[in-house]
Every structure is written in C-alpha cells, then in structure tokens.
Amino acid sequence: MAQVACGIDIGGSGVKGALVDLETGEYIGDQVRIPTPNPATPDAVAAVCREVINQLNVKVGVPIGVTFPAPVFGGVIPYMANLDQSWVNVNVDELMERYLGRAVV
C-alpha cells in the first residue's frame, strides 16, 4: 500500500488540497479547491482547510502539510502579503492543529 500525505495550499484566491502518493508524487483521487474566504482571516481560512480535509476524507494518521503565502518562522507568520493582515504574529501550527484536530507541517 502506498504511503499517503495530504497537501493543502492556501492562496489569495483559493485553498487547494489533494492526497499524494509519497512514493510516486502523483495525486490520489480528486483535488479540491475552495475559494479563499473574504476577509481571509485566520479562523475563516482554517475552517476552509478543515472543509478541504473533510471533502478529501483524510483519515486519522495521514500527515498533512500546509503552505502559506508568507514566511513561517517557528510556526509564526511575521508578515502577510496576500491574506488578511490579522495573520501577522499568528501561530499557524497551533491554529491548524486546533481546526484540523492533528499536527501539521
């Protein structure tokens, strides 16, 4: 059985997600895209990420990686360009763990 991970890409216009075969790098099944909420506050975007993993039916134990349109240092976003400025100084590790119910990378 293939090793699987879930990737979530948070962008200014959409939050995209897919399951990926870690051995081949290929997508497994459908990809999901949900428009980025407006305003794109941390809680609103995290709720969309939760919807992405629900639509993908990501099983407990499957690792989840999340990308942001900003640098992340020690789990914290120091500045933000494409989303709401309320992201500045948010600990995204804690935010995503709270919304997704598991640790993310």
Annotate the PLM regions.
Residues 2-47, 77-79:
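Short glycine-rich, Thr/Ser-proximal phosphate-binding strand/loop in the N-terminal lobe
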Residues 2, 59-61:
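A general structural motif
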Residues 30, 42, 46-50, 62-64, ...:
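Glycine-rich phosphate-binding loop and adjoining helix at the ATP-binding site
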Residues 40, 58-59:
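Alpha-helical structural elements of signaling/regulatory helical domains
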Residues 9, 25-26, 58, 96-98:
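A generic structural signal for short, solvent-exposed coil/turn residues
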